[in-house]
Amino acid sequence: MSAVKTLEAVARDRVGKGAARAVRRQGQIPAVIYGGGQPPQSIAVDLIRTRTLIYAGGFKTTLFEINAGGKKVRAIPRDFQLDPVTGVPLHVDFLRVVSGQTVTVEVPVHFVNEDAAPGIKKLGGTLNIVAHTLSLEVAPDQIPDAIEVDLTGRAIGDVIHVSDIKIPAGTYTGEATDPVANIVPPTVLGAEVEAEEAAIAEAQSAEAAEEKAEESAEDEKKDGEEA
C-alpha cells in the first residue's frame, strides 16, 4: 500500500485568476481541498515539491496529510492542471478523506515473471497489454501502489482476465471477464506493422502522384499561355 505522504501548505484568503497568478509568482501552486461534507478550503503548495510528486508517478493514488496553517487534513489528489507548453503544474484539486469513505482510482498494472512465460521466452510471442491500469473502488489508506500480474506458465494464445488477478485491496469497478492482456504469436503484431507500413507507403505514393499531376497541368498551362 502507498505510504501517507506529508505536504506543507498555506491557507489562501483570496481566490480568482489574479490571486492565482500572485501565488505562482511566489513559487507556489494554488490548490483546493473539497468534499467530506465541509466547505472547500483554498490553499497553496510548494511548486518544486508538488512538481516532483506529480512527475514521480502515482500522484493520484497517493494519500496526503496536508498541513495548512497548523491544521492537518488527509486528502487525495483528484485532478491537476499542467501548463501545455512548459508542463509546470498550475493547479491541484484534493478530495478530503473522511472515515469510512471509499474513492475510485486508476491503479497501474505491472506484469512480472515474463521470463517464466513459455509463450514469450521460448516461442517468441509478444505480450499484448490491453489494460495499463485498473479502476478500483477502495479506501484511501488501502490504495495499492500497483496490481501485479504473474505471467509464469503463460502460453501463446492465453488471455488474462481480471478474474485471473489477485486484487490487493478494494473492488474492481468493471467486469471480471474484462481482458487485461494476451500473448500473441510473433507473426501477428509483425503482420499488423507491415500492413500499417504498406498503407502509409501507398498513401505517400498516391500523394506524390497527385502532386506530379498538378505540376504537369501547371506546366501545360504555362506553355499554352506562352504560345
UniProtKB/Swiss-Prot annotation:
Biological process annotations from GO: translation
CDD domains per UniProt: Ribosomal_L25_TL5_CTC
Chain segments carrying region Disordered: 199-227
Assigned GO CC terms: cytosolic large ribosomal subunit
Alphabetic keyword roster: Ribonucleoprotein, Ribosomal protein, RNA-binding, rRNA-binding
Functional note: This is one of the proteins that binds to the 5S RNA in the ribosome where it forms part of the central protuberance.
GO molecular function: 5S rRNA binding; structural constituent of ribosome
Subunit structure: Part of the 50S ribosomal subunit; part of the 5S rRNA/L5/L18/L25 subcomplex. Contacts the 5S rRNA. Binds to the 5S rRNA independently of L5 and L18.
Family: Belongs to the bacterial ribosomal protein bL25 family. CTC subfamily.
Species of the source: Methylobacterium radiotolerans (strain ATCC 27329 / DSM 1819 / JCM 2831 / NBRC 15690 / NCIMB 10815 / 0-1)
Pfam families xrefs: Ribosomal_L25p (PF01386), Ribosomal_TL5_C (PF14693)
Presence of the UniProt keyword Transmembrane helix in the record: no
Biased composition (Basic and acidic residues): 209-227
Highest taxon in the source lineage: Bacteria
Listed InterPro entries: Rbsml_bL25/Gln-tRNA_synth_N (IPR020056), Ribosomal_bL25/Gln-tRNA_synth (IPR011035), Ribosomal_bL25_b-dom (IPR020057), Ribosomal_bL25_C (IPR037121), Ribosomal_bL25_long (IPR001021), Ribosomal_L25_dom (IPR029751), Ribosomal_uL5_bac-type (IPR020930)
Protein's UniProt keywords contain Ribosomal protein: yes
HAMAP family in alphabetical order: Ribosomal_bL25_CTC
Official protein name in the record: Large ribosomal subunit protein bL25
